[in-house]
Regions:
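Alpha-helical segment proximal to the catalytic Tyr-Lys
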Residues: 129, 173-174, 245
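Short C-terminal tail/terminal secondary-structure segment
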Residues: 149, 237, 248-263
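Residue(s) in the substrate-gating loop at a strand-loop-helix junction
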Residues: 144
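Substrate-binding pocket helix/loop in short-chain dehydrogenase/reductase
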Residues: 100-101, 105-113, 139, 217
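Short, small/polar-rich loop/turn modules that mediate ligand/substrate recognition or access, typified
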Residues: 90, 176, 181, 247-249
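Conserved glycine-rich cofactor-binding loop
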Residues: 9, 14-18, 40
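Active-site helix of classical SDR
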Residues: 124, 160, 168
Length: 263
């Protein structure tokens, strides 16, 4: 199926590993020109090199901390300078630390807000003028299944991702007339480096091994396994494509049936 992504210019945040990397790789496979970033410039460059070698696509890896105004501006400016435009933005701020209410202080709350919510809004602010001018754009935010059903022990993630979802839905209505779509992808438990770290943290509190914790999570989904990052990326790529031109303002769950809600 032709997705209409050939020669589109895509920015993917936090893409040196995990879901972000899988998104950058899948977009490159479809022929998009990809600019990816990571806080670690060396890891970003290495990720870009691997994707280019596998796909032959033009891929640039840039060191950028998107919680910093100047770094985010430089990332977007570089993409515009080299590619001339920006068609697709994938925000992927990463999850804030696990914890319950008693673990959270105001400083941690602010840091989580900056990481998960403000970084995505900042990037949208930077790319939207270009998208509006060309009357085309795709913004996809990586959130979490927690926006449908909050997860015990992830108070910060539950709170921040719900806020990001409200912003995204509102923005989708504001920019629809400019042929810009804004959607979210809400992954379930996914086999990433971060998920393994979370498994270790939860396992210690519950007196289990990491492997036992991963098995517990897998059993919570009717599909009875955890997702691979590539399965999340496939949903992102579809929403970034011309095939999804009439889809906006949604949160697409990719959770193996984990969420029990009807809507």
């Amino acid at each position: 199926m032709e997705l209409g992504l050939k020669n589109r210019v895509a920015l993917v945040a936090a893409a040196s590993q995990g879901i972000g990397y899988a998104c950058a790789l899948d977009l490159a496979r479809e022929g998009a020109r990809v600019f990816l970033c990571s806080r670690d410039a060396e890891r970003a460059s290495e990720a870009a090199r691997r994707i280019h070698e596998e796909t032959g696509a033009t891929v640039a890896g840039i060191g950028a901390d998107l919680t910093n105004d100047a770094a985010a501006e430089a990332f977007v400016a570089l993409a515009k300078e080299q590619a001339g435009t920006i068609d697709v933005l994938v925000t992927n701020g990463g999850g804030p630390p696990a914890g319950v209410f008693d673990d959270v202080d105001v400083r941690t709350l602010r840091e989580a807000f900056e990481l998960t919510v403000v970084s995505a809004i900042r990037m949208a602010k930077l790319v939207l003028p270009t998208m509006k001018q060309q009357k085309y754009g795709r913004i996809i935010n990586i959130t979490s299944m927690a926006v449908k059903q909050p997860i015990d022990g992830l108070l910060l993630s539950n709170t921040m991702r719900a806020g990001l979802t409200g912003w995204s839905k509102t923005l989708s209505n504001e920019v629809a007339q400019d042929h810009i779509t804004v959607n979210n992808v809400a992954p379930g438990y996914t086999l990433t480096e971060q998920q393994h770290e979370h498994a270790i943290t939860r396992a210690r509190k519950l007196g289990k091994s990491k492997e036992e914790m991963l098995d517990v999570w897998a059993a919570q989904a009717p599909i009875n396994r955890l997702a691979n990052p590539e399965e999340i990326a496939a949903a992102v790529t579809f929403l970034a494509s011309d095939r999804a031109s009439y889809i906006t303002g949604i949160t697409l769950q990719v959770d193996g049936g984990w969420s029990k809600g009807l809507l």
